[in-house]
C-alpha cells in the first residue's frame, strides 16, 4: 500500500511532510553525530550535501538552524525536496563531475558541514573539495573494502548499478578516506552506528582500522559478511591510496 501511495506525487509529498514534522535524519545516528560535532567545532551554520533523499539525508537534523545546499541528479527527488523542505535549504539539480564543482565553493563564505554520499566518486570529489576547509566532513565509506587502503577508479559517468559486483563496487575504504583527510589536517571523529558514514574534524583521533564498522543494512539484505562482499569485487579495478 505504501509503495502505491508513493507513486502518486501529491500523496507522496503529503507523506514526506508528515515524516518531516516528526523529525527526519540519516540512515542511522548521523544527525546526532553532526549536531554534536558542529557544536564541538563551533562550525558555521551552513552545510553542503550531495547525494540525498528528500526525507533521508545526513544533514537533515541541521535544517532548523542552518542554511543548506542540497545537490542531486535525480529530477523527481529534486522536485519533491523543493516542495517539502524549508526555504533556508537551497536545492540544485546537477550531475556532478570533477570539472563542474566550482559552484560549490561559492555557496557559502564558510562551510560548517560538507557531506558526500554519491555511491561512486566520493573519494575523488572529497579530494577536490577539501581546500574549502569545512569544520566537519561527513562521507560515505565502503565497508566491503575492509581495512584496505583503496578507492574505485574515477569515472565521470560512474553508475554503481552498472558496475556489477552486486552494487558493492563504489567509493573508497575507511582507511583511504582517513589518509586523504589526514593529509589536510583532519582526523576521524566518529563512525555511524549502522556503518558506512564517517565523520572527520580537525581534532578527530580515532584509528580507522579499529573504528571501522560493517554495513548493517548490506548484511541484512544480502545475507553476506564483509569478507564475502570483498571476494565479489576484489578483481575489479582499484586505485591504491
What are the language-model segments listed below?
Residues 109-115, 136:
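Short SAM/SAH-binding signature in class I
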Residues 2-13:
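Short hydrophobic helices that act as membrane-entry/anchoring signals
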Residues 22-107, 116, 120-123, 143-146:
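SAM cofactor-binding core of SAM-dependent methyltransferases
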Residues 66, 133-135, 186:
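A short helix->loop->beta-strand "cap" motif at the edges of active sites that frequently abuts
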Residues 12, 16-48, 55-58, 101-104, ...:
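Rossmann-like AdoMet/SAM-dependent catalytic core
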Residues 134-143:
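Conserved beta-strand signature within the Rossmann-like core of class I S-adenosyl-L-methionine
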Residues 62-63, 129-133:
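Short, conserved loop/helix-junction motifs that constitute active-site signature segments
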